[in-house]
Amino acid sequence: MTGDTITTSTESISHHTGSISAYLATPSRPGEYPVILVFQEIFGVNEHIRHVTKRIAAEGFIAIAPHLFQRTAPNFAIGYSPAEIMEGRLHKEQTTGAQLISDIQATIRYAHTLPFVNPKAVGCIGFCFGGHVAYLAAALPEIEVTASFYGAGIPTTTPGGGLPTLECTPNIHGTIYTFFGTQDPLIPVTQIDLIERTLSTHHVNHQVFRYPTGHGFFCDQRSDYHREAATHAWEQVKTLFNTLKTPDSI
């Protein structure tokens, strides 16, 4: 399946508060495909997130990236300048964990209505802010596999305030892979150690990957991009996501 052509579109997901815009990428060939939710950085569903979504679809998945800042900034998508970082953080600070969970559940319900979907095979991936969101989503019963990239604040906070997201670890029933840079100023190594210990304590099937990089090493549009780390991490993501496939679809 790898490398097959894909189809992309912008979709509207019904939600009890209105609707959520989302970027959808699907394999063009008929089949039965797992679903992967793609969670944005603070920069919205921008070119990088759309590219990741397409890469996942090309590997044989239905991939969908909901706009997580839809309430404050519909269809938000910006770059990586200092001013844009400040803008993205402003919207992040207006987003709560309860809203995110509600949006994720709405996205899963929407995905289940799509043609060629395997509704029992759902995973997620997220980067930066989205890496934190992915850890939060991992505790949902629908999520079987999670890839969380450099999510800051997991042991100390949750979006909008409340108990730290790390407290949801006992509810993770699937497999979670986390990816961190040991030179990331936003995520001290002591926090990475704590996440790893907590996952082990609660017997969550997991792997914690550490790279000698800074923050955002997977994104080739950021100054901390690290080709070797990004390539290695992508191979781990593919291995993880392929566990969702039936033997005849790999």
Placement of each model-derived feature along the sequence:
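N-terminal cap/leader regions of alpha/beta-hydrolase-fold enzymes
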Residues: 1-250
